[in-house]
A protein has these predicted regions:
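Short glycine-rich substrate-engagement loop in P-loop NTPases that contacts/grips substrate
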Residues: 1-24
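Conserved catalytic/switch belt of AAA+ P-loop NTPases
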Residues: 9, 13-14, 27, 31-70
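Short conserved motifs of the RecA-like P-loop NTPase core
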Residues: 22, 102-118, 149-154
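Conserved AAA+ ATPase "sensor/coupling" helix adjacent to the nucleotide-binding pocket
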Residues: 71, 87-101
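Conserved AAA+ ATPase "SRH/arginine-finger" region at the nucleotide-binding site
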Residues: 73-86
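C-terminal helical "lid" of AAA+/P-loop NTPase domains
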Residues: 113-118, 124-139
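Conserved C-terminal helix/linker of AAA+ ATPases
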Residues: 130, 136-160
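Conserved P-loop NTPase/AAA+ ATPase motor core
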Residues: 160-169
Length: 169
């Protein structure tokens, strides 16, 4: 809310005044901020108190204040390729520290291709399906969890197709 934003701005001003440092403010789902909240940030973006980074799944030209947009650079992050999603899946299955490697799972090649293809470039969707497969599949006699095509097909979640106001996704 507004009180939170006022606290962030006060801390940013303090950083700038005491240490000569600018504050980077990252706002996820910036399209959920109403016009008043976005307007509140504008003078602090203009005077350099705040470097604003906003992320949105919506078309920023419809959902973000035009004044903020005119003082911003817009970067579009494109979906990952199937090969990139496959690499992420394999890394997650094998990595014992940051992934699910401690579960001792293996994913069959056809299951890997299937999940990466159905993810449509969305790593989160693919990784959620793999995690569900690992957590719900009993270990085989060899002590490993095998993610087969059958397991993978049971773990997929229906992909939501999103459209913006112009009908483009």
């Amino acid at each position: 809310g507004k009180k939170d934003m006022e606290e962030v701005v006060a801390a940013a001003k303090n950083n700038q005044g005491m240490y000569g440092k600018k504050t980077i403010l990252f706002i996820d789902e910036i399209h959920r901020f109403n016009k008043g909240q976005q307007d509140y940030l504008l003078p602090f973006v203009e005077d350099g108190t705040i470097i604003l980074i906003g992320a949105t799944t919506e078309n920023p030209y419809f959902e973000v204040n035009g004044a903020l947009l005119s003082r911003s650079s817009v970067f579009e992050l494109c979906p990952l390729s199937q090969e990139e999603v496959e690499t992420l899946i394999l890394r997650a299955v094998q990595d014992e520290k940051k992934g699910m490697g401690s579960y001792h799972a293996v994913i069959e090649e056809d299951a890997l291709h299937f999940l990466a293809d159905l993810a449509g470039g969305d790593a989160r969707s693919a990784l959620n399906a793999v995690e569900l497969g690992i957590l719900t599949t009993p270990r085989s006699e060899d002590g490993m969890i095998h993610i087969t095509l059958e397991v993978a097909s049971k773990c997929i979640q229906k992909r939501v197709v999103r459209y913006d106001k112009t009908g483009d996704n």
